[in-house]
Amino acid sequence: MLLKLIVALSLTLTLASATSDPKGWFCSFECNDWNQLEMACQKEKDCFEKTNNQFTNETVACMQPCWDLGIPCRTQCYKVYDQCTSDCPYTVPNPYECFTTCFKEAFAEVKPQIPKANLDE
């Protein structure tokens, strides 16, 4: 039951963030492999079980190392997103095409690889 609640809450927050935080929403897709690493870490740590299914400061402290795993990818994604948004204003003939081309090329150069130690787990 708790898992269903967490999934429903995550979906709701993801949809809401698509409009309120387009950069975060966009980068969540671009860094999906890193997000999977975070989720595997959370599952392994089982922080909610340790806090009797309560979301407390202890839960946050338990989960923080997992959340931090995705920082390298999100940091690079946010930088590239901002740069391409700046380089492709709505005044260019096709801003969406400009942005997607800019992002694809620039992010391919800087997206960090998941450390091999994490891939073996």
UniProtKB/Swiss-Prot annotation:
Location of the protein in the cell: Secreted
Signal sequence region: 1-18
Record has Signal as a keyword: yes
GO molecular function annotations of the record: growth factor activity
Keywords: Glycoprotein, Growth factor, Secreted, Signal
Keyword Secreted listed: yes
Coiled coil: none
GO CC terms, sorted: extracellular region
Chain positions carrying an annotated carbohydrate: N57
Function in brief: Interacts with the p75 low-affinity neurotrophin receptor. Evokes neurite outgrowth and modulated calcium currents in pedal motor neurons. May be involved in target-derived trophic support for motor neurons.
Protein known as: Cysteine-rich neurotrophic factor
Originating species: Lymnaea stagnalis
